Amino acid sequence: MNVKLFTAAAEGNIEQLRLLLENGADINARDKGKRTPILIAAQNKQYDAVRWLASNGADINTQDNKCFNPFIQGCIHNDLTLVKLMVELGCDLTCLTRFGGNGLTPAAEKGHEEIVRFLLENTDINVNLTNTVGWTALIEAIILNDGGEKMQRIIRLLLDHDADPTMTDEWGVSPLELAYRKGYHEIAKIIEEYL
């Protein structure tokens, strides 16, 4: 029955999902990767199925063996529609990625500007959360990207929404120093405006 449930979720077949649940399927069943039907629907951009599953008792915050849930999935894979839906459904913004960051961290690092803007302007997500190596979203956006115009806008967005430019990584290195080390002089100038 679970294979049918996962297939129906992937296809967004709400009628099949309804029938399976009426016949005893577990709405929070897990596949080999610990994915639930709602995560499978989310990964396949089946937004109506995501909403339906959530409204019928699916746990929207359950994470798979890679720490993905629908919210983290949307943040990492630049799916603004999914991120907005999960926030609307009341997802837990404190769920962490496998590296210990919240959804803002990979969105900033990967240059998903619209998601970063949405999260900062519409939620109370922790902009200064540190991951397993002491990196904030601000630090990740500097270290793991190209320093280009999009990243400059993201850096400014983070700083405009109270990212702390004095927080250092676990080795005591500041965002300003990291920007200079990477040769990102424009980002360094932006950070200096907030010091």
Regions found by a protein language model. Give the residues of each.
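Conserved ankyrin/ankyrin-like repeat signature
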Residues: Q16, D48-A49, T81-L82, E114-I115, ...
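Ankyrin repeat domain, specifically the short helix-to-loop turn at the C-terminus of the second helix
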Residues: R18-D26, R51-D59, K84-D92, R117-N126, ...
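Ankyrin-repeat-protein effector appendages
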Residues: M1-K4, I143, K150, I154, ...
